[in-house]
Amino acid sequence: AVGFVVEDMLRGPRLVLADIGRDVEIFFGEGGVEADLADDAQPHPAFARLSQSYDVQPLDDVRDLAKRRILLLAQPRAFSPTELVQLDSWVRNGGRILILADPALQWGSLYPLGDKRRPLFTSMLSPLFAHWGLELVLPIADAEPMAIRKIGQLSIRTQTPGEWLKIGRGGSARCALEEGGLLADCKIGKGRALLIADADLLDTVYWEGRGMRVLTGGDEFGNLAWVESLATSSSPII
């Protein structure tokens, strides 16, 4: 299990960005542990961008969250029942979590289908979401799989985004659905969970826009700006 702790060098609050299980290769590439440890290892652009404002340190275990305040998970591996209980308890005791969970991940991989090192195609956190009164679904529509969403002043581009649905009586959380169901903002005990029904939006092919970067020096789409704003947000929707 691999993750990383990030401390905001400008504004103060701690941010834990965890890639537990290495399913979405945001830390380095897909060359394996040996390549990650090489002197010339290159971080994923999303990780590198966050590192410009945050001090990044390794995180390996859910139990290490005890003294942390904010956690980000991007399409993580399946958690054990014990880990799910620990994660839920941490949030209820005041933790804040941002999860990017994808029902149909399109993120490119060096590994073939069936290889355990390949990113998970669909999120494995359904038990946790159901406990919070939510279900992650993939909408059936005739629209093109490539999606551009306008969120505030930002334009977000991704592929096959999912949608959150409320189930039952709301489970053990109070959740508000925003952005057409792409975002769920949940009050859970003393803590808060922000859930994005998509993880592909972290992939550079959807936001970096190298031609645009040459011309303007900025991103073509605001995917990373949106994720960072949610991770550091202190104003709940509900």
Where are these regions (language model features)?
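Short, surface-exposed patches at the edges or C-terminal ends of soluble domains, predominantly
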Residues: 1-238
